[in-house]
Amino acid sequence: IFMREGRIVQTMDSRYPTCTDGDTIAKQIRAAIGTGAELTDVGSAKPFYIEADTPAIKACIDTYNEVTGDHATPFTMGGGTYARHFPYAVSFGPEHVDLPLPEFGGPMHGANEAAPIDKLLEAVKIYIIALLRLEEIDF
């Protein structure tokens, strides 16, 4: 929130489900704000989503579960990833937020990011097998 030319300005960034679109959301916001405010400079990007039952997603999650012995299921997240820059891609990899880290270890994607060696080697195995399986799929 900031002031511009004597007016309060608020920027907004929101994520919305695949069952709607940016124009519909903008119309609903305009209808809700009434008088004394306006919605301007609306930009929108189509939500990025790939169904969990596609062969590629199944190959990735099946590989993860077979290697780890887990029973994980695919999930979506609200933030954007590098995957949205490709027509048919997802971010994929193990996420172990519950593991103890070395004293110097930082959080995932943060300064001094750390993970136990056995989990890094397990991740390499998952990636190799998943890539070999993905190579067999006719996209």
Give the ranges of each region predicted by the language model.
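Midchain, well-structured core segments that form catalytic/ion-binding scaffolds
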Residues: 1-27, 45
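Short, contiguous acidic/charged loop-to-helix segments that flank catalytic cores in large enzymes
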Residues: 15, 46-51, 114
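Short, low-order "capping/linker" segments at domain edges
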Residues: 49-67, 93
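Zn-dependent metallopeptidase/amidohydrolase metal-coordination segment
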Residues: 70-137
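Generic non-transmembrane alpha-helical segments
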Residues: 24, 28-36, 59-67, 85, ...
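Conserved short beta-strand edge segments in small beta-sheet-based binding/regulatory domains
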Residues: 35-43
